[in-house]
Amino acid sequence: MTEKTYTLEEQLALIQRGAQEILSEEDLVKKLKLNRPLRIKAGFDPTAPDLHLGHTVLINKLKHFQDLGHEIYFLIGDYTAKIGDPSGKNSTRPPLTDEQIKANAETYAEQVFKILDKEKTRVVFNSEWFNDMSAADMIQLASHQTVSRMLERDDFSKRYASQTPIAIHEFLYPLVQGYDSIALKADVELGGTDQTFNLLMGRTLQGRYGQEQQVCITVPILEGLDGVNKMSKSLNNYVGIYDAPGTMYQKLLSMPDTLIRRYFEFLSFKPMEEVENLMAEMEDGRNPQEIKRILAEELIERFHDADAAANAHKSAGNVLADGELPVDLPEVTLELEGQDALFITQILNQAALAKNSSSAKDMIKRGAVKVDGEVVDAGFSLTAGQTVVIQAGKKAYAKVTVD
């Protein structure tokens, strides 16, 4: 089967999709005009063993380049993980142990090949070249930058101004990451917007070492399901790529409508023309839950399989008797009004999921009240900031948020 060929304009359109910044687009065009596979690099420190959808924004961009016929280098920073990336941190980040790095790194390849073509991806570890680097070589590398240049970085400058300690090894991180681009002779490096300084460091160092400078492309940090903070396990606003199909389905259908376009742009592989048509349908009155369902099924098929995608709604919390999540799930916001928490009886009454307190207590006693698919007792409560899906009886349901 002959692989599709892309015009320069088609390549640029796909590369620009979801990209925050391209430094510089003029250089990128020059490289694309060479009509040879470009060496595309993205580095990942194995700081956590499991990926969520926020991590896949960058991997999806690698997939775009892969589909265009370019060479993909998925760099696992096992060496740099021993330093600890200070990007965006207001304090020194503790380095990982060799055992932690090995355990975390082992899970990466398996997960990324849910997206990337294994046969067309080179997985490399930066310990391959750094383990053989001498102290003299490292000092030589450090000589290519100044302390004043390092302090131009936002997080370093803030810590310096507030007299928060900055360890010398943290200054090495951008240099070491930059040297990765030299070792791989990268044409393009991808990273999150929090990595701009480090990506540009690689571009600068390539020039100092006599190489053609890489193009730097940043992608946005994806908001989590709360629509405010970045997707993070610690904030419990994430969708894990290993989440069960029903869990993934329910989480994605719970996202705010304001995130639909961004999630499609960054997470879906549907052509943007098709995405724009879906957005237009929603503006014309199509239920947003139906649009979310389309995205949920695409992602579940990618990370599980087509059968799981077709049946995910049946295990998504059993909100209705047949397992189908309603597309018009009512949303209710409740106020604490000076209380530390709201108990389930109060919640059922205030959310109009029960006729009265007696009815609420009776349903709870009969095990007819479920929160996110789990039966709860009278001791269940919600505190500020929590959002859940509640089913009371066979047909009463609501998405409840406590302020």
Swiss-Prot record:
The record's GO CC annotations read: cytosol
Query: Which amino acids does the record list as binding ATP?
Result: K233
Pfam families from the xrefs? S4, tRNA-synt_1b
**UniProt main location, coarse:** cytoplasm
Q: What is a biological process (GO) this protein takes part in?
A: tyrosyl-tRNA aminoacylation
The record's keywords, sorted A to Z, are:
Aminoacyl-tRNA synthetase, ATP-binding, Cytoplasm, Ligase, Nucleotide-binding, Protein biosynthesis, RNA-binding
* UniProt-listed Enzyme Commission number(s): 6.1.1.1
The UniProt record lists the S4 RNA-binding domain at 342-402
Q: Which reaction does it catalyse?
A: tRNA(Tyr) + L-tyrosine + ATP = L-tyrosyl-tRNA(Tyr) + AMP + diphosphate + H(+)
What interactions and quaternary structure are annotated?
Homodimer.
User: What does the UniProt function comment say about this protein?
Assistant: Catalyzes the attachment of tyrosine to tRNA(Tyr) in a two-step reaction: tyrosine is first activated by ATP to form Tyr-AMP and then transferred to the acceptor end of tRNA(Tyr).
Q: Which PANTHER family match?
A: TYROSINE--TRNA LIGASE, TYROSYL-TRNA SYNTHETASE
- Know the name of this protein? Tyrosine--tRNA ligase
The source organism is: Psychrobacter arcticus (strain DSM 17307 / VKM B-2377 / 273-4)
Q: Which gene encodes it?
A: tyrS
